[in-house]
């Protein structure tokens, strides 16, 4: 199915691109989420009429993400978790725990933005973690996992 992208989508394209995707991806995700429209003549004309408005909205979203990225870059976030004598955690530190610690520090973040390529953190220590605030704004933070006081 051919669609018009209404925002930048990683791996697909930029605002205004006409791309071909699988029918299910378009019908079940992109179109209901407001990220795309079918590439019909009427929708193409409507998009061209709204192009400046959509570009301004995307620029505003990117500027907000860049501002949050500058606040986050280089920050150290501490997460306390119960741990054994050998430094291994009882349980693990997930992206939800890290997002909650970032929010507690006063910066907006959701768990879907926190990238843990090697899975949840399972030991005490410091870890480099990426927080993807936008496809063009990725902040690198340090997560310090410490043993919680009994």
Curated annotation (Swiss-Prot):
Keyword Ribosomal protein: yes
InterPro entries, per the entry: Ribosomal_bL9, Ribosomal_bL9/RNase_H1_N, Ribosomal_bL9_bac/chp, Ribosomal_bL9_C, Ribosomal_bL9_C_sf, Ribosomal_bL9_N, Ribosomal_bL9_N_sf
Keyword Ribonucleoprotein listed: yes
UniProtKB keywords: Ribonucleoprotein, Ribosomal protein, RNA-binding, rRNA-binding
Coiled coil region boundaries: none
GO terms for MF: rRNA binding; structural constituent of ribosome
GO BP of this protein: translation
SUPFAM superfamilies registered for this protein in UniProt: L9 N-domain-like, Ribosomal protein L9 C-domain
GO (cellular component) term, any one: ribonucleoprotein complex
A Pfam match: Ribosomal_L9_N
NCBIfam families reported for this sequence: L9 (TIGR00158)
Entry function: Binds to the 23S rRNA.
Family the UniProt entry places it in: Belongs to the bacterial ribosomal protein bL9 family.
Protein name, UniProt field: Large ribosomal subunit protein bL9
Taxonomic source organism: Neisseria gonorrhoeae (strain ATCC 700825 / FA 1090)
Gene: rplI
